[in-house]
UniProtKB/Swiss-Prot annotation:
The last Arg residue of the ACP-binding site is essential for the weak association between ACP/AcpP and FabH. Homodimer. GO terms for molecular function: 3-oxoacyl-[acyl-carrier-protein] synthase activity; beta-ketoacyl-acyl-carrier-protein synthase III activity. The gene is fabH. HAMAP family: FabH. This is Beta-ketoacyl-[acyl-carrier-protein] synthase III. Its EC number is 2.3.1.180.
Amino acid sequence: MSNIKIAGIGAYLPSLVVTNDRISEFVETSDEWIVQRTGMRERRISEGENTSDISTKAAKLALERAGIDAKDLELIIVATISPDMFIPSVACLVQSNLDASKAACFDISVACSGFVYGLETAKALMMSMNYKNALVVGAEVLSKVTDWTDRSTCILFGDGAGAAVLKRDEAPGIIKSYLRADGKKGEALTIGATDFDTPFSKEKKLAKRTIDMNGREILRFAVSAIDEAVTEVMKDTNVSFDDIKYIVPHQANYRIIKLAAEKLKLSEDKFYLNLEKVGNTSAATVPIALNEMYEKGLLNKGDKIILVAFGGGLTYAATLLEW
């Protein structure tokens, strides 16, 4: 069995719903202004659950649907830019929560591209290490790194987690991936980490520990990145756009997806969107959307879909897979 397939999908969203009207109570904005510029109406916000907590809840659902016991997991990868702490990794915390004692564990920091990067990373390790199964999680508690006085960013982000269990299978699964980055544009989207203030530093450097984003630069990059990644992941596969049931994009902003669809000369109906209710949950957007599609009965065995994402780094990626 040389193919790697998604065997189970799961997601978890905090219960607190924060509407645009609620945000307008503490920054100068309105529901109309936010919807017009982003397509978003509400997002979920954690009231205390950390990244490992929501990751574990999404993972348990994915494992249940895959019919795999956590004790049999051989690999756990968590994609996040909002970990509980620097060390241990969120993946190690999830391993402990699940009692998945056999699993190798690590986090990847690829921002909004993280889940797509994680799938291909897990596939490669499963092939090279002969693992039978793996867990890939995209999870964020972005509310703790959001500047709630910055109207340009606080309207965008939400909290949530999505998880996929991968297993070896005779049937096709992950067909091809395309991973890229442009580090020269990295300053367009940043979150500071720690202050540089030691007895040996020449000057004190204070980190801005909240999201700082150049929205215009990200929009230009994102439209081009989606076009390139989707086009490249289709090359040499004998798969046409007519064969693709859905493209599942990172849910960053409706305008980005609209412009990308136009550039690809595809109908917007080909793109699955749920940002209106969930907002931008960074590495979690793609698996949360996949989980929603699964629960709505939109994904059938043999369906071909493309996952495409872009984000901090700057990074971008796409995966062509068969459900």
